[in-house]
Amino acid sequence: MQFEVKDLINKIKKDGLDEAERLASEIILNAKQEAEAIILKAESEAKELKIKAEKEAYDYKRYSLEASRQAFRDLVIGTENSIKSLFKSALKDSVSSVYDSNFLRELIIRVLDVWGKDDKIDIMLNESDIDNLSSILKTSIRNKFGAEIEIKPFKGINKGFKVQQRDGSLYYDFTSEAIADILFEYLNPRFKEIIKLD
């Protein structure tokens, strides 16, 4: 019986040890699997974070470059517009300087020479030019055209004049502003080539 008890104790020990080893192996295996899953999850999250960070960096770089390009375009357009404005102002001043009393008188007479003699015409000048030219123009014009032409002051004119039929059907603008605008439009393509920054 002693051997049976001893065998029974040994068997219980062996079964307990086997069970403990099996449980330990199972715990170790589960721990390894959990560790591998945690590592895989961490690697996957790290990869996603890296991809997200790279995309954000790329987007930031792209947006920064686009903002820089837009700022440069705005600067070029602003500079071009400033230069155009200066050029247009200088052109207007240049045209205005030509419009002295003698030039205006000659130009008005030449414009009226090609106008129909039966038309009723209004000539509009600024007030200072009317004071300087009124008597000379009235004498020159009335000799050719009679009373069909009136000379009127017009506050909106700096230099130059406007001519229109009294019924308003035909109108010509010979003001320094209008002539400068026409010249600027004519010169603008050439001007653009000169200041082209490409």
UniProtKB/Swiss-Prot annotation:
- Which cellular components does GO assign to this protein? proton-transporting two-sector ATPase complex, catalytic domain
What GO terms are given for molecular function?
Answer: ATP binding; proton-transporting ATP synthase activity, rotational mechanism; proton-transporting ATPase activity, rotational mechanism
For this UniProt record, the keywords arranged alphabetically read as follows: ATP synthesis, Hydrogen ion transport, Ion transport, Transport
Q: Where are the transmembrane segments?
A: none
Keyword hit for Transcription regulation: no
Please state which protein family the record places this protein in.
Belongs to the V-ATPase E subunit family.
Q: By what name is this protein known?
A: V-type proton ATPase subunit E
Query: Which organism's genome codes for this protein?
Result: Borrelia recurrentis (strain A1)
Biological classification of the source: Bacteria, Pseudomonadati, Spirochaetota, Spirochaetia, Spirochaetales
